[in-house]
Amino acid sequence: MILSKPILLSAVQPSGNLTIGNYIGTMRHWSKMQNNYECLYCIADLHALTIQKNKIHLNKSILDTISFYLSCGVDPQKSIIFIQSHVYQHSQLNWILNCFSQFSELLRMTQFKIKSNCSKKINAALFNYPILMAADILLYQTNFVPVGQDQKQHVELTRNIAHRFNSLYGHVFTLPKPLITQHGSKIMSLLEPSKKMSKSDINKKNVIFLLDDIKTVISKIQNAYTDSETPSKIYYDIEKKPGISNLLEILSAITNKDIDILLKELEGMLYSEFKNIVADHLSKFLYKLQKSYNDYRNDEVYLKKIAYEGAMKSQLKSNKTLTKVYDKLGLIPLF
């Protein structure tokens, strides 16, 4: 008897150039995940509409994101890569789950609080964002969702909604679990290491973009915040050494070395020497990634073929869950 692999869903918004934080937090794990999980990789273009309405930019970003999936080792023969809006079941289940969600639950979502405090022009979709995320997850009977600490609350909300529905109608949804790595799941801003690195940061010197040219990467690392301790002391302590710790996280991820091993190699170095090492390794890493990315990105016919095949497979899987939901609620399916 062949045991089926647990199901894993990972989604990325096509809302602009991805960062080294995106890579270290999620993307670097994509290739290995295929060995242990049945993986679905989603380009969350509907989520992107909460903040982006530019047609040309969104269209380009969707194909960019598929290229990043492929360049990071996702194999379309092993996994499913699909565009969220191609699978209509996401929107259908989204509305149904809204009917089983509490207004007070959504008000407690930390990410919404942060974003609503930053702008008065908040649309309703941003408020309901976690419900669509729940639909994304529950449609595929997902067992695990790789997320950062900032998204963990959304997975917990998804579990609550699923449990609420199951309590009323019997077992329909699998309760998903967040998959969080110990190190590197949250890369911080280069100049302000007290806040998370974000591709939407106004100050681009805070962010390493995956498509930054090499000179820019070196400059950003060399100007990254460390501290004024004399003589230089390189050790890992997020509270006392946020800048140093952040650079150690980056170096550890791209070299595949434990931080403890790196600290022995870096012992006695000046901060400037440490930064040069980080910049050198990061530049070489990004050069290889960018070459692979560009090879895929230059073949849009292939990218659209991948998206089409992924949509067909995703619709078959998601429709099984949606049919169960319709049956439990007394809705009449089209077929």
Swiss-Prot record:
Keyword annotations of the record? Aminoacyl-tRNA synthetase, ATP-binding, Cytoplasm, Ligase, Nucleotide-binding, Protein biosynthesis
Write down the Pfam families for this protein, in alphabetical order: tRNA-synt_1b
Q: Where does L-tryptophan bind?
A: 136
Localized where? Cytoplasm
What stretch of residues is annotated with the motif 'KMSKS' region? Answer: 196-200
**Family matches, as CDD domains:** TrpRS_core (cd00806)
Q: Tell me what reaction this enzyme catalyses.
A: tRNA(Trp) + L-tryptophan + ATP = L-tryptophyl-tRNA(Trp) + AMP + diphosphate + H(+)
Primary localization: cytoplasm
Can you tell me which residues the record assigns to a coiled coil? none
How would you summarize the oligomeric state and partners of this protein?
A: Homodimer.
HAMAP family, per this entry?
Trp_tRNA_synth_B
Protein known as = Tryptophan--tRNA ligase
Source organism:
Buchnera aphidicola subsp. Acyrthosiphon pisum (strain APS) (Acyrthosiphon pisum symbiotic bacterium)
Q: Specify the taxonomic lineage.
A: Bacteria, Pseudomonadati, Pseudomonadota, Gammaproteobacteria, Enterobacterales
